[in-house]
């Protein structure tokens, strides 16, 4: 592993820093990526100073399946890759307006967030894979330009990106680019640890541990696939286990990956899913974040079939998928435009209460579909 000398996001460091700041003179929203303060310190303070009375006040976003470079050649008229990349940029503009949005007016999230102010600026945004459409060098360059790790305009909050099945194999430009990107984030203090090859990463925000395992948590290539193919998870399960071994069983953990957790999925096989479950079932996993399906969902892992196959005992974990930037289109029809102006899961943890709500930029901001009650979520993350 490639650890930092210390985790700059540790709770002890956070409290000692805040203790010498005057609340009257400090405003986290005046900090920028060019602040004379170190970038990691600036973003740390953003994540904790919005709610002075709370021991923890952490906000982060989940988006997925950007598919930069998608070319709708068969729509009428064709909607090319440059037009699609402009669509991505417009979606990012919408995302930049999420901070300051009032929470849903009713329901469990509204109740939990009463008196705690609107959506704060996030500590960061996680992009759960399929960053590009075909994983070539041009598409990677465009993704890295549109969503740089330092933060895209106008959001200016860090972007944590994962490789998906559209992003090519171990030697391809996307995974190679992610390695360089991760090294930059390590140097800036935005991640605490990288895997030996720098593809997988881990960091801590206000005592909440985040682990990025990219495509899915596994060791060894899928049967029949080449070592250099996208089917190589590059020892992500070993990395996950090594991180969890350093984390107490009751400490909150979030795991981010691309592939989904459905028992019907054939993208990663049953033995690998079981090995993953065995690795995490003794830990306080407060959220599993994923993409791949393009669906907006909140599910439980393991589902009933897998749960029975895994022995029928042990915890189940909450899984979240935010949707996609890439809409479905029909041959011979016009480009349909996005399903919503944007699709983003917004998470906030205040003290030991986690809330999650799906943001679409509809009137009022939040998802109002028939599935909205299922997507809205509140839970206590403290192990009793």
Predicted regions mapped to residue ranges:
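N-terminal active-site segment of His-dependent metallophosphoesterases
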Residues: 51-138
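Histidine-centered catalytic micro-motifs
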Residues: 256-260, 286-296
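Short acidic, glycine-rich surface-loop motifs adjacent to enzyme active sites
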Residues: 247-264
């Amino acid at each position: 592993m490639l650890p930092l000398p210390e985790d700059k996001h540790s709770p002890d460091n956070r409290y000692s820093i805040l203790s010498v700041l005057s609340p009257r003179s400090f405003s986290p929203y005046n900090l920028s990526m060019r602040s004379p303060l170190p970038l990691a310190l600036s973003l740390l303070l953003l994540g904790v100073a919005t709610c002075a009375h709370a021991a923890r006040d952490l906000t982060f976003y989940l988006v997925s399946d950007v598919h930069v470079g998608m070319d709708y050649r068969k729509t009428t008229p064709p909607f090319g890759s440059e037009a699609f990349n402009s669509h991505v940029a417009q979606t990012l503009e919408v995302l930049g307006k999420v901070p300051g949005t009032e929470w849903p007016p009713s329901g469990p999230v509204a109740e939990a967030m009463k008196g705690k102010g609107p959506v704060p600026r996030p500590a960061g945004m996680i992009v759960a894979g399929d960053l590009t459409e075909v994983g070539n060098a041009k598409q990677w360059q465009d993704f890295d330009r549109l969503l740089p790790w330092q933060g895209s305009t106008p959001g200016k909050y860090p972007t944590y990106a994962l490789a998906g099945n559209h992003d090519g194999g171990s030697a391809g430009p996307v995974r190679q680019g992610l390695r360089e990107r991760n090294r930059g984030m390590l140097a800036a203090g935005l991640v605490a640890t990288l895997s030996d090859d720098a593809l997988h990463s881990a960091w801590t925000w206000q005592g909440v541990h985040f682990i990025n395992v990219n495509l899915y948590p596994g060791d060894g290539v899928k049967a029949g696939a080449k070592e250099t193919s996208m089917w190589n998870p590059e020892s992500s399960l070993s990395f996950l286990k090594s991180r969890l071994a350093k984390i107490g069983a009751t400490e909150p953990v979030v795991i981010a990956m691309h592939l989904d957790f459905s028992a019907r999925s054939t993208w990663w096989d049953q033995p690998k899913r079981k090995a993953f479950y065995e690795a995490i079932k003794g830990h306080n996993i407060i959220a599993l974040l994923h993409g791949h399906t393009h669906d907006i969902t909140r599910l439980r892992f393991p589902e009933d079939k897998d749960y029975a196959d895994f022995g029928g005992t042990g915890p189940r974990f909450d899984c979240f998928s935010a949707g996609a930037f890439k809409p479905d289109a029909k041959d011979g029809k016009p480009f349909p435009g996005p399903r919503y102006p944007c699709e983003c899961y917004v998470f906030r943890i205040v003290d030991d209460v986690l809330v999650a709500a799906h943001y679409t930029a509809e009137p009022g901001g939040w998802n109002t579909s028939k599935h909205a009650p299922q997507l809205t979520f509140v839970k206590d993350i403290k192990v009793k």
